[in-house]
Amino acid sequence: MSVVSQVILQADDQLRYPTSGELKGIQAFLTTGAQRIRIAETLAENEKKIVDQAQKQLFKKHPEYRAPGGNAYGQRQYNQCLRDYGWYLRLVTYGVLAGNKEPIETTGLIGVKEMYNSLNVPVPGMVDAVTVLKDAALGLLSAEDANETAPYFDYIIQFMS
């Protein structure tokens, strides 16, 4: 939920107008809109490149994942890993656009550790996967945009750790 929606819902729940501080928060959110859109466009337009670079780094670090018996062994499992990379990149993009981490949590993180555990996917490997995805994505952004984006990746990494 965006900052604007949060302020409106909170004020409405309390039967009041938004406070001056809340309105300043909305103003700050709106002034960063162009940056958030620029980041989202860069991530979306470069998804394939980011995912490709990240998977190369992960499987270089953990070649056992692609070996027989590994979680990314075989084309089907490998494609599922790449699909998950794209999914996590989209989650970060949703957070950046909303200006907060709520879309990441509500759209994608509830139950994710349990799901991976039930599928015998090593959660530390997924943490490594999101870490290399972060590195690949931030490498395409300016320093300012990378600083804005990094906390969304960090939130996922911390949640899964």
UniProtKB/Swiss-Prot annotation:
One of its GO terms (cellular component) is phycobilisome. The keyword Nucleus does not apply. (2R,3E)-phycocyanobilin binds at residue 81. It is found in: Cellular thylakoid membrane. The modification N4-methylasparagine is found at residue 71. It is a peripheral membrane protein. Disruption phenotype: Increased levels of phycobilisomes (PBS) and photosystem I (PSI), decreased levels of photosystem II (PSII) per cell. Cells are unable to undergo state transitions. When combined with an ApcF deletion mutant the cells have decreased PBS, PSI and PSII, and require glucose to grow. Its main location: membrane. Keywords: Antenna complex, Bile pigment, Chromophore, Electron transport, Membrane, Methylation, Photosynthesis, Phycobilisome, Thylakoid, Transport. Contains one covalently linked bilin chromophore. Gene3D superfamilies: Phycocyanins. Belongs to the phycobiliprotein family. Heterohexamer of two alpha chains, one alpha-B chain and three beta chains. PANTHER family: ALLOPHYCOCYANIN ALPHA CHAIN, PHYCOBILISOME 32.1 KDA LINKER POLYPEPTIDE, PHYCOCYANIN-ASSOCIATED, ROD 2-RELATED. Light-harvesting photosynthetic bile pigment-protein from the phycobiliprotein complex. Allophycocyanin has a maximum absorption at approximately 654 nanometers. This is Allophycocyanin subunit alpha-B.
